[in-house]
């Protein structure tokens, strides 16, 4: 079974890869619910792995998203690993690894400098102390680590927007974005 990306998904993949090639700053893809974020993740992971030969860690907040993202990646025909106690698998054998935060955090020694990219699904909910610890740990082994987030809601209650600049480069006022993790919203896919 294969898949075909919709034009807006393909554009998101191209824009994300351009961003990842140009900077080590964290970038964010905002895409409405049902926009096919799992397929976007799969295509980015497949292409970056093919370009670099290095490992990619895809982090999601729960087993259900882990299974959904892994199933979409399976459509690429490329092998992948799961690293999640809730999925009964803790492997980093293949270049693309789908993991849950707690399982990865509890075995950070399994994640080395060979990881060039962390993709955060549900980035608005994923920016927890555990995720930040994972990023810091892998970045200490690979200072060129890239981080890419995907979300349908780039706003976190109590903190505001999770990015510093919108897709047009306009800075988000400090009162609307308290210490945002992502440097820029690099893609915006609206439901309209």
Residue ranges and their predicted role:
Residues 35-43, 48-75:
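Conserved Walker A/P-loop ATP-binding site and its immediately adjacent core
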Residues 73-110:
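Inter-Walker segment of RecA-like/P-loop motor cores
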Residues 66-69, 91-92, 106-107, 156-163:
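Switch/connector loops and helix/strand junctions flanking conserved nucleotide-binding motifs
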Residues 54-55, 93-96, 115-117, 143-148:
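Loop/turn-to-beta-strand initiation segments
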Residues 124-192:
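Post-DEXD/H (motif II) to motif III coupling segment of the RecA-like Helicase ATP-binding lobe
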Residues 62, 99-103, 150-154:
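A short beta-strand-to-loop transition that corresponds to the Sensor-1 phosphate-sensing loop
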Residues 1-30:
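Conserved pre-motif I regulatory segment
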Residues 96-136:
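Conserved RecA-like ASCE ATPase "motif II neighborhood" in helicase/translocase motors
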């Amino acid at each position: 079974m294969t898949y075909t990306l919709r034009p807006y998904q393909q554009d998101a993949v191209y824009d994300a890869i351009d961003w990842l090639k140009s900077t080590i700053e964290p970038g964010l893809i905002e895409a409405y619910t049902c926009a096919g974020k799992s397929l976007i993740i799969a295509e980015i992971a497949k292409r970056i792995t093919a370009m670099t030969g290095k490992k990619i860690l895809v982090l999601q907040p729960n087993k259900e998203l882990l299974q959904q993202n892994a199933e979409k990646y399976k459509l690429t025909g490329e092998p992948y690993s799961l690293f999640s106690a809730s999925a009964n698998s803790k492997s980093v054998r293949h270049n693309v690894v789908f993991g849950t935060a707690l399982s990865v955090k509890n075995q950070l020694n399994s994640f080395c400098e060979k990881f060039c990219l962390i993709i955060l699904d549900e980035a608005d909910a994923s920016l927890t102390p555990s995720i930040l610890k994972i990023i810091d740990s892998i970045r200490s082994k690979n200072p060129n680590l890239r981080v890419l987030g995907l979300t349908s809601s780039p706003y976190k209650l109590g903190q505001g927007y999770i990015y510093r600049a919108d897709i047009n480069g306009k800075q988000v006022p400090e009162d609307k974005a308290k210490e945002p993790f992502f440097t820029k919203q690099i893609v915006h896919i609206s439901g309209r």
